[in-house]
């Protein structure tokens, strides 16, 4: 109550921000006539002027009014679109690093140009992030004439681009692309072995379109670059036969073998279930008599069993995945889109493949990963746009430090949102849905029907076919036709069935999207120019009449067949209607068989239903029920927020480690001289080794000199008689021994360096260091995954799992860093440099650098190999023959003192040439 009184007196935070922005709008509008008076050349010259002013010390905020005025006038001339005042406010919100909530149809794509142009003037690059390749290419294509007119370059990142093209796209002033591509490029850049293979620049400023979809809905989905791990494919097939023999419990405490917790999306084996599963596995010969699934030796069996149970109980065809070309393709539960190329982890994808009888592909091992939460927080400045952010404003603020500003519409919203209609059963609900669609179709009113799964969209489609109603289905299976179907969903009498929010980013124009239709005619090569003009003219004349007819029928009618877990998704569906002041309406049809009501609102809602006791087919509309449903949604939203926050808290630990590793890696890549770093590493490793066998402040009787000598000989090929040193000088201590050993190693290393040349040795060091870091980091990620999967069990010992995870992860990271230094020092000091007379061959380019990571050998194995093998595997992962005979047969010649064509950095006579 006090809050409401304060808002009435002082206005809300949103009101105060809008008031400030409107003052800037007035300054921009005051410049409009001045900009209109400029010639094209003078208007274009403004970009160079702004850049010079920034170089002279002026700020982006200082030139904002003029830059926005220039962008608006340039847009009017090149695109035929002038920014409204509310769009200017949206542009300022984006520039300030906030989220602009703008309703559907308010021109978010055009709004972005203002902030993008202003920030691109700084020359550090701007990324415009969209949800799919189509929208990235479309938006870049639409806005490129504007940016080019203003002297700025535009690049687009799409999934199948080559590295060289990606570099060019990122080098542009403005780069459009998807969240996945930006994130994966960041990870790939931190796996390269040559700094010139990187594609991204610094992460400066990003404008995220559909920011709620990317930063909220996909926040729990990490980006992972992986390679195949060793795995027993046959075990998935065998384990797939176990779940049908186990009995599912009706209730958590009921009889049976396992309980499916749909709320938490988990499967829990009961004590009886464990015993039953052990009996089955024993009969199959997978488990020894009287052995337990809990024993350490049977962890893999338990892993496969739980994966099979989850695949059978929680993941359903045409809801969570589809089968396409003999492969399991995941369906995004929020958008209904296919997520080609993505796979579930922890053996789940293989278990689903076994269940469906398709080819089982090996489990993957993580090489690099990052969540969207941590990737987007790497940008110096981040902003976003969406039609629905206010319900998640707290999460945006607490996790991303992004404030949400609600931008008023250019015209008042005329959409009517009717009360929910609730039925006893799903059958009654869908009958009412079809009846509503039929009535709309008769009066020519277009209808968009939203469903929460492919299964339901196909059910609605089947019912519409029975009723003889023509319609389009838009779900993951129709991804290619998505934009076309959505664009024409506003035609007279059109019926479109859409899974979730598929088609976001494409406006539904009442009367149909004229531009899409005219573009299709212009692209038709079978028509002559005269025929094209005639068809376009007829289309334009008929469009206005169709538009007016749809307006009279009430505009676009939205039907929701189910409430989503999040109110935001429901609002997105509603928001497809009533764009730019158009008429429209919306209504949700629910039943007590819907998952949301069944899982979260059943008890109290059922009591209300029993009191009202309607007849079959009669809907209930009651404020109590509506509040109960909204309460259930808030409960689920809170739970999902907690889960995302928990993911972030755990990933923050790995993120800090990732930053250190990537920073060190980048330093190695970019440094011309790493000799000081190498010297420091050798010194640290020798000191640690001596401290291990001659602990500081210990008695001489506690020293283990023989083992120290053996380790030095085995790991560093350093053969020193330390015991004779001690006999010769009673005053010698651990520090003296360290200094002598370090001196010996440095002298030998200096001799090697002189033999091959300082630059060649530096290149060799750099490549070995990067390979060691990548291998050790990969193993560390796997260990962190295992730690995280089991850390919750610490709570049974009255310990805080998060604190335990942080503590153990820190210890593991210290071990990782020590291991990296040890392997680098060991490998490089044990390298033997030989000189042999060799034939001469011609240099050829290095092979695919990326294969170093996918086929990199185990470092422990490398330690026991000869120098020739080491060089061959470290710098020639694909096994190309660089021997003199092979190169001569290929007609290639290299001089004996030239660099070896394998890319090791050594001279040919000291590398593959010595095989001769």
Curated annotation (Swiss-Prot):
Belongs to the SecA family. One of its GO terms (biological process) is protein transport by the Sec complex. NCBIfam families: PRK12904.1, secA. The lineage of its organism: Bacteria, Pseudomonadati, Pseudomonadota, Betaproteobacteria, Neisseriales. InterPro entries: Helicase_ATP-bd, Helicase_C-like, P-loop_NTPase, SEC_C_motif, SecA, SecA_CS, SecA_DEAD, SecA_motor_DEAD. Part of the Sec protein translocase complex. Interacts with the SecYEG preprotein conducting channel. Has a central role in coupling the hydrolysis of ATP to the transfer of proteins into and across the cell membrane, serving both as a receptor for the preprotein-SecB complex and as an ATP-driven molecular motor driving the stepwise translocation of polypeptide chains across the membrane. May bind 1 zinc ion per subunit. It is an enzyme of class 7 (translocase). The keyword Translocase applies. This is Protein translocase subunit SecA. Transmembrane segments: none annotated. ATP binds at residues 87, 105-109, 507. GO terms for molecular function: ATP binding; metal ion binding; protein-exporting ATPase activity. HAMAP family: SecA. The keyword Ribosomal protein does not apply. Gene3D superfamilies: Helical scaffold and wing domains of SecA, P-loop containing nucleotide triphosphate hydrolases, SecA, preprotein cross-linking domain. Keywords: ATP-binding, Cell inner membrane, Cell membrane, Cytoplasm, Membrane, Metal-binding, Nucleotide-binding, Protein transport, Translocase, Translocation, Transport, Zinc. It is found in: Cell inner membrane; Cytoplasm. Its cofactor is Zn(2+). Its EC number is 7.4.2.8. It is a peripheral membrane protein. GO terms for cellular component: cell envelope Sec protein transport complex; cytosol; plasma membrane.
